[in-house]
Amino acid sequence: DVAVGGVNDALARALELTDAEPLCEDGLGRVGQLSEPLALAEFARFVCRRLGCNGVRWADAGRPVSRVAVGGGACGDEIDAVIAAGCDTFVTSDLTYHQFLDAAPKGINLIDAGHFPTEDPVCAKIVAYLEKEFPQLIIIKTTSHKEVIQYFVEGE
């Protein structure tokens, strides 16, 4: 989404990105910095832990992770904007095979963290907002809306 304080700001905060700014002119996505560069495998584990993912799909362009773009939900079509913003890594969801295939030659690490996990971080903020605006109501975040995709990894 493009809302200030919305899905993408919450995702950037969840991944501890600093100096987050919009990725696209229309406000979609966010770009920020890690406090220190990480290897992609280490960052992928960090993303899993921070977003509560069952797993992530990733493609390694051979670059350390430092300047990161995020797009909650399906933002794979924004890879050119990620490149233009000088990012080395893009965290989003619903990426296609060809987007993964094309990423490494363009110098972009990709992490597909799943649609639900990349949008869910905003829910706590929405609950807090509703509790503040409507103190007479009891606001409960649903537990039935959750990640539905499971992964089977050979050898586990």
Across the structure, where does each feature detected by a protein language model lie?
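Active-site catalytic microenvironments in core metabolic enzymes, especially phosphate/sugar-handling
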Residues: 1-156
